[in-house]
Regions:
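Bacterial N-terminal signal peptides that target proteins for export
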Residues: 1-11
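Bacterial N-terminal signal peptides
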Residues: 10-20
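Boundary at the C-terminal end of the N-terminal hydrophobic targeting segment
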Residues: 22-27
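N-terminal pre-domain segments of enzymes
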Residues: 28-99
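Short, intrinsically disordered, charge-balanced linker/junction segments flanking boundaries
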Residues: 39-45, 490, 508-520
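Mobile, glycine-rich extracellular loop/lid and propeptide segments
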Residues: 71, 75, 82-402, 407-430, ...
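Inter-blade linker and blade-boundary elements of WD-repeat/beta-propeller domains
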Residues: 432-444, 485-491, 544
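A beta-strand-loop signature enriched in Asp, Gly, Thr, and Trp
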Residues: 472-504
Length: 579
């Protein structure tokens, strides 16, 4: 069901902080490695095959409640040893890799020590589905300087906290959220408000804009979805919010419209080249025959709609083709091209029946009507018939490494548990047609999840954790035979649906990388940390909040400036070092 469903890595700080992408014709992605690093060439390749695990509701055995670390008060006075960094969008960058390469305090050694633990819990007014975001060293209108933590809730509230003292700098309600009962879909309870991670565009030390989508119901059964541009310093709208209401003409006549009751902004927002991008999915596959998935583009300066792509072009039963990706954002390459994966829906390129269900789609920056490339699994019909969305997982671009002879690559995965490695520069339609094949297919566990990437001292590594499965690490071969090879695995499994891991490290320095993942249970959420090089047993594990339906939480932690933030039901739990 639908709701059950640049930085150039190691790049200059200013590019990472603004979330902007390099322009130009090339769609190759690059990151520099330190001189003593080696690419993953010549590694023996292997096929990794694991039986697909069925979807399951997992109840985690609660960990002993460690509560606040005894040194929590000391942590509030502890300065960050490195240069503070910003996290302005979902999963850190536009690929989106989930890698923060600017972390100096949190290492495998420090996280495993007795000095690491829970610092505090922030109480908020609703579900925290959106990843918290962080703006460091920001000058407020009164000229005071703060590291600002942004938290958005399902109750349509945005909080701005001082990320040292956790005093509330401001909070803002964007309206009355939509009632789950009125919407008619109870995947998320009790309300739908802000569900997608906002994106922040920072232009100066004292100037930043939060772009956020809020679903509201100001009167009974009066549904609205609006894009806001909010001043980070004051919490006020910088311009009139824009009603999200795209429409498109169909090849078969008539129009398709956005449905604010049965559709929502679940895919996180992204920013590139002056534009805000978002994906639109459906609630519980409701009103399936009358709605389409969308990728939308808005001018960041005016909030006006400047581009749209509807994933169906002909009216027919059970179309949908939602762009929801369990909260993962669209991916953007350095040329500004947009990549997404669609969910349940028909696939056809025949006029009068055209649709892009169960597909990776690549779109030009302006979202021109014709995709620049697509990939559709050969078994798309069985995926569609079995509610086994390809689009329950996100698309992640892999950075092009120095000396890489392989083409730019993309990984994607979904409920069927197949991880596809694709040539991102040559997406050529239906798998098997004309001999077209993925670069590699690896059978793993079902995914309501997303991958992460880290460029370590031995080269690129992809991290993936599916439903009830182990966290797995795959090295990336970048020679003429591109492939993924499993090189490590955790000793413990995931919760319901899998995880959205993130990686923190001090660049590619050996011994500094940690993989973080939220294990989703019902109702308990747990945060776990692993040595990125070896995985194995967790370095640290702790309860980090509850959720009314853990398999639907789709949570991603924020890791930056020596701290870890985990959103849950009406809380954000903060972890860090005390000395």
């Amino acid at each position: 069901m639908a709701a059950r469903r640049t930085i150039l890595l190691g790049l200059c700080a200013s590019l990472a902080l603004t979330g902007t992408l390099a322009t130009g014709a090339s769609a190759r992605l690059h990151y520099p490695l330190p001189p003593d690093s080696t690419a993953v060439n010549g590694v023996a390749q292997q096929k990794v095959s694991h039986a697909r695990m069925p979807a399951q509701e997992i109840r985690l055995a609660p960990l002993p409640d460690k509560g606040l670390h005894p040194g929590a008060a000391l942590w509030l006075k502890r300065p960050y040893a490195g240069t503070p960094t910003d996290v302005l969008r979902y999963h850190n960058d536009n690929y989106p890799t989930g890698w923060n390469p600017n972390e100096t305090d949190l290492t495998p050694a420090s996280v495993a020590s007795a000095s690491f633990g829970q610092i505090t819990t922030l109480n908020v007014d609703g579900n925290v589905m959106a990843e918290p975001l962080l703006v460091s060293n920001f000058q407020m209108p009164d000229n005071s300087t703060h590291d600002v933590l942004i938290v958005a809730t399902g109750h349509d509230t945005i909080y701005a906290y001082d990320a040292q003292t956790y005093a509330v700098l401001w909070q803002r309600s964007l309206g009355t959220p939509q009632s789950t009962g009125d919407v008619g879909c109870s995947d998320i309870k009790p309300e739908y408000g802000i569900s997608s991670t906002p994106v922040i565009v920072r232009s100066a030390q004292n100037a930043a804009t939060i772009y956020v989508v809020a679903a509201t119901e100001p009167a009974h059964l009066s549904f609205h979805t609006k894009l806001h541009a909010i001043d980070l310093g004051t919490g006020k709208d910088l311009m009139r919010p824009h009603e999200i209401a795209p429409a498109a003409s169909l090849e078969t006549g008539g129009k398709i419209h956005f449905d604010p009751q049965n559709q929502w902004s679940r895919s996180s927002l992204a920013y590139a080249n002056g534009a805000i991008y978002m994906g639109i999915g459906s609630h519980c596959d409701s009103n399936a025959g009358a709605i389409s998935g969308w990728v939308l583009r808005y001018d960041a300066a005016t909030l006006q709609l400047t581009g749209k792509f509807n994933t169906i072009e002909a009216a027919a039963g059970y179309e949908l083709s939602s762009v929801w990706m369990s909260g993962y954002s669209v991916a953007l390459d350095p040329a500004g091209n947009v990549y997404a994966i669609t969910g349940n829906g028909n696939y056809s390129l025949t006029k009068g029946h055209k649709g892009y269900g169960e597909s990776v789609i690549a779109l030009a920056p302006d979202l021109n009507r014709t995709p620049i490339g697509t990939f559709t699994p050969s078994n798309w019909q069985s995926l569609n018939n079995g509610d086994t969305d390809f689009g329950s997982g996100g698309a992640m671009l892999l950075p092009v490494a120095p000396g890489q002879t392989a083409p730019p690559m993309l990984v994607g995965m979904g409920k069927a548990g197949t991880m596809y490695l694709l040539d991102a520069s040559s997406l050529r339609g239906l798998e098997g047609q004309g001999g077209y094949q993925a670069l590699q297919k690896i059978q793993l566990s079902a995914c309501w999840c997303g991958a992460a990437y880290y460029a370590g001292p031995a080269g690129g590594v992809v991290y993936y954790q599916g439903n009830g499965d182990l966290l797995r690490a795959f090295s990336v071969a970048i020679d003429g035979t591109p492939s993924l090879t499993q090189v490590a695995a955790s000793s413990d499994g995931a919760g319901s649906g899998g995880a959205f891991p993130v990686v923190s490290s001090n660049g590619a320095t050996s011994g500094t990388a940690v993989v973080w993942a939220i294990e989703r249970g019902n109702p308990t959420e747990q945060i776990k940390a692993y040595n990125a090089a070896t995985l194995g047993a967790p370095l640290f594990a702790a309860n980090a909040g509850n959720w009314s339906n853990g398999s639907r939480s789709y949570l991603t932690p924020l890791v930056a400036n020596g701290r870890v933030y985990v959103g849950a039901f009406k809380t954000v739990t903060v972890f860090g070092l005390t000395n």
